[in-house]
């Protein structure tokens, strides 16, 4: 039996879920150790993927100052002691951390109990916790470049449907704006500027603007007089079908989104979230754009001229779109979670 820990936000939790599902397929039992704060409970409370789920009283340390930081460190140490006892109780063979602040307790607990620790780093720049824990880990897995001696490159765990619904793009007919489930105001506002011109050029538009911004964006399109020409929606659980239909996507550059688009063969214009820790979204996107697989623009650089120059370069150069689409699909293989678990099995047997 092994333990999965970490989460807080959807990107980390999606990795945890992929690993748990793969383990369950192989009749491997696992427990989950997360936090009472963040999305951990929403995702896994009562989940049949795990034999037991524990949500410890822990919080993030990095963004705290003064007394708040001291309290957060104390909570993490208390959670680490609790996790140590949980690991012993279930005779856990190893711990897999998927990152995020809620991984702190069980990861430190693993070190305290001498339980092998494996880490998955989802971003191009290591999170603070993963940076601290790397020397103590048996291996660290990632899909971007890694510099540590114990780094093992694997495909990013992406759901099968992003591969099965993939296609090589030949022509640029349909553009998808992904403002995210929360709504990225910078992307949403830029869409309002550029969409009328895109429509004039014969490009059809779908726009996910997030629950919070849906009414404002809908009214704005109505005011411009193009609401009937734009497929505007707040959120769609079947986002894979939206990606499949698109020939180009303007989106943030969280790791999951990037690799899902890569698996799907969809080229992106990436607008990193400006307040992401260590600016990791910028470096995530840079991994792709330095290979010519997309365009990277800071929110402050978003303007129609830059975007249309990029669109025109894709339209004018014969085979440019299909070549990039092919290259994106070749960067990632299915079964990323299986690959990680196989590496762990091999390392544990030595």
Curated annotation (Swiss-Prot):
NCBIfam families: murG (TIGR01133). UDP-N-acetyl-alpha-D-glucosamine binds at residues 9-11, 123, 159, 181, 281. GO terms for molecular function: UDP-N-acetyl-D-glucosamine:N-acetylmuramoyl-L-alanyl-D-glutamyl-meso-2,6-diaminopimelyl-D-alanyl-D-alanine-diphosphoundecaprenol 4-beta-N-acetylglucosaminlytransferase activity; undecaprenyldiphospho-muramoylpentapeptide beta-N-acetylglucosaminyltransferase activity. It catalyses: di-trans,octa-cis-undecaprenyl diphospho-N-acetyl-alpha-D-muramoyl-L-alanyl-D-glutamyl-meso-2,6-diaminopimeloyl-D-alanyl-D-alanine + UDP-N-acetyl-alpha-D-glucosamine = di-trans,octa-cis-undecaprenyl diphospho-[N-acetyl-alpha-D-glucosaminyl-(1->4)]-N-acetyl-alpha-D-muramoyl-L-alanyl-D-glutamyl-meso-2,6-diaminopimeloyl-D-alanyl-D-alanine + UDP + H(+). It is a peripheral membrane protein. SUPFAM superfamilies: UDP-Glycosyltransferase/glycogen phosphorylase. The lineage of its organism: Bacteria, Pseudomonadati, Campylobacterota, Epsilonproteobacteria, Campylobacterales. Its EC number is 2.4.1.227. Pfam families: Glyco_tran_28_C (PF04101), Glyco_transf_28 (PF03033). PANTHER family: GLYCOSYLTRANSFERASE (PTHR21015:SF22), UDP-N-ACETYLGLUCOSAMINE--N-ACETYLMURAMYL-(PENTAPEPTIDE) PYROPHOSPHORYL-UNDECAPRENOL N-ACETYLGLUCOSAMINE TRANSFERASE 1 (PTHR21015). Its main location: membrane. The gene is murG. Pathway: Cell wall biogenesis; peptidoglycan biosynthesis. It is found in: Cell inner membrane. Cell wall formation. Catalyzes the transfer of a GlcNAc subunit on undecaprenyl-pyrophosphoryl-MurNAc-pentapeptide (lipid intermediate I) to form undecaprenyl-pyrophosphoryl-MurNAc-(pentapeptide)GlcNAc (lipid intermediate II). Keywords: Cell cycle, Cell division, Cell inner membrane, Cell membrane, Cell shape, Cell wall biogenesis/degradation, Glycosyltransferase, Membrane, Peptidoglycan synthesis, Transferase. The keyword Transmembrane helix does not apply. This is UDP-N-acetylglucosamine--N-acetylmuramyl-(pentapeptide) pyrophosphoryl-undecaprenol N-acetylglucosamine transferase.
